[in-house]
């Protein structure tokens, strides 16, 4: 009987249709005991005996693939796969899949929630009242302000639609053009530097790659409009956190809303902890009850399809394996 390891904390030992999808296909499910994100030492004992992994925030490095001779598929819940050494996966003939189209609405809602938390001072007002105060300061409106989206994939476009509903002007930067969407919704494409100067709010919607790692650095932040806001619901590694701290402490940026950090959970010395103008959430943007269910079911389905030697082309990251991959 093939065995699949269940990685995400929110799915381990939890009911769900994804379990039925896998058990109906003849899989035995393994639910490890471990931290919110399983560590390498918690995954390692299971690797020699599993055929697939339904993954969340677990890191899969080259040395782990080397001790997983039966492993044929890693099905990632979500669309980011920067924690998986895809080159090593390909070298060991392990298909890596993602779940496109399952969580963009959840991420977009969290993006807007962070934007409003910053602009309307929701968190700081809450803290003041709970500590016995009652301060009523004016805030700037969102309507009429310019939102700059860096990245216009499914998530960026979902954010754009919500911002437009609040009568914001939306500008965007991406190397991929969705001309029909842009024209239909009045979205203007700008060069990156112009977007930074123009936008009242900059929101990041990019994968973490060698090209994007640390792109939000001192120079990037200096180009942003004075008094603007930064929102990040993609990957913490996009931002140089010490540089962001400096921009926030100096007042060049008014505030930042972050669902992601470079190290999660944050280490005690994280430079952003304790800043009154930073609103944080624990990397939950993509995981509401609906999106978690959809991601789990699609991930389970891709494992089953691969086991049956069907190729879920829209979900496989390392498509170069297709011609000679076998379960």
Predicted feature locations:
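Short beta->alpha connector loops at strand-helix junctions that form conserved
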Residues: 33, 77-78, 94-105, 174, ...
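Phosphate-binding beta-alpha-beta segment of Rossmann-like dinucleotide-binding domains, i.e.
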Residues: 92-94, 100-146, 158-161, 310-317
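Glycine-rich Rossmann-fold phosphate-binding loop(s) that bind the pyrophosphate
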Residues: 152-153
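An N-terminal-biased, well-structured beta-alpha scaffold segment characteristic
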Residues: 1-97, 217
């Amino acid at each position: 009987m093939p065995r699949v390891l269940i990685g995400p904390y929110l799915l381990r030992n939890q009911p769900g249709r994804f379990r039925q999808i896998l058990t109906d296909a003849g899989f035995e499910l393994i639910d490890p005991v471990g931290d919110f994100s399983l560590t390498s030492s918690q995954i390692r004992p299971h690797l020699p005996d599993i055929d697939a992994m339904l993954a969340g925030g677990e890191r899969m490095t080259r040395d782990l693939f080397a001790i997983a001779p039966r492993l044929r598929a890693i099905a990632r819940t979500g669309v980011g796969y920067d924690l998986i050494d895809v080159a090593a996966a390909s070298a060991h003939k392990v298909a890596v899949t993602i779940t496109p189209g399952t969580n963009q609405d959840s991420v977009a809602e969290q993006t807007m929630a962070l934007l409003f938390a910053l602009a309307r001072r929701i968190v700081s007002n809450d803290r003041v009242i709970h500590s016995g105060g009652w301060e009523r300061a004016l805030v700037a409106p969102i309507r009429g302000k310019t939102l700059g989206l860096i990245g216009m994939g499914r998530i960026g476009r979902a954010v754009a639609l919500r911002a437009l509903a609040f009568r914001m002007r939306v500008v965007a930067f991406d190397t991929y053009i969705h001309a029909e969407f842009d024209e239909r919704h009045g979205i203007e494409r700008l060069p990156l530097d112009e977007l930074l100067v123009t936008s009242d709010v900059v929101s990041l919607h990019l994968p973490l790659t060698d090209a994007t790692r640390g792109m939000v650095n001192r120079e990037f932040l200096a180009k942003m409009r004075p008094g603007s806001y930064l929102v990040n619901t993609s990957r913490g590694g996009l931002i140089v956190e010490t540089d962001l701290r400096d921009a926030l402490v100096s007042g060049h940026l008014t505030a930042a809303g972050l669902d992601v950090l470079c190290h999660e959970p944050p280490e005690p010395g994280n430079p952003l902890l304790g800043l009154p103008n930073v609103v944080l959430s624990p990397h939950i943007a993509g995981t509401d009850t609906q999106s978690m269910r959809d991601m789990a079911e699609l991930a389970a389905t891709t494992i089953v399809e691969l086991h049956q030697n069907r190729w879920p082309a829209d979900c496989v990251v390392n498509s170069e394996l297709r011609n000679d991959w076998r379960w």
